[in-house]
Amino acid sequence: MGRRVGGGMASCCAAYYQERCKALITMSAQSMVEELTLSGIREAKEIFKQDGQLDRLKKYHGEKAQWVLDAWTETWLSEAFKHWTLDEYLQKIQCPMLIIHGELDEYGSLNQPQQYIKSSPAPSQLYIMENTHHMPHKEKPEEVLAVVTQFLEKLTDFTQLNHTANEQV
């Protein structure tokens, strides 16, 4: 499971470790560069220049907070990153996927989660959360928990059914 950039990282893990990855869940994950993402990053870059804002990142990244911020913003805003996509990895994913995305996500349009579905041959469930922005787990934690639980329960039932069928062979 991964959120935002972590969703991309989780996707790469699912692509590389197909035999070991049983499921992939992403939330608010980018699958490509688009202007909505870039404008959100430009805005965040300006916000983090304000007094006290970098301290929010220091809570998670300590003294490397500025480096983390610069690595994120400068990579995404660079000309070299302009045509980046996850497509080559998404095409390799075989495990079931749950793709969660806020309808009003200010960093990524609905094209982001739809690209996951379009580019991967894996069985997938796209869950668009209505009236939700970039932080579904904070905005509607109960709904996120419910949809993830339901997905994992179905996966468990399928895995047990598949395991039982294999034992009978």
Feature locations, PLM:
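Short aromatic-enriched loop/helix-cap "lid" or pocket-rim segments at secondary-structure transitions
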Residues: 35-40, 111-112, 139-141
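Conserved hydrolase catalytic core segment
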Residues: 1-35
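A catalytic-pocket lid/entrance helix-loop region that shapes and gates access to the active site
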Residues: 37-62
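A short, basic/aromatic alpha-helical/loop segment that forms part
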Residues: 33, 106-107, 135-138
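Catalytic active-site module of serine/aspartate enzymes centered on a nucleophile-bearing elbow/loop
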Residues: 124-125, 130-169
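Active-site nucleophile elbow and catalytic-triad environment of alpha/beta-hydrolase enzymes
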Residues: 72-89
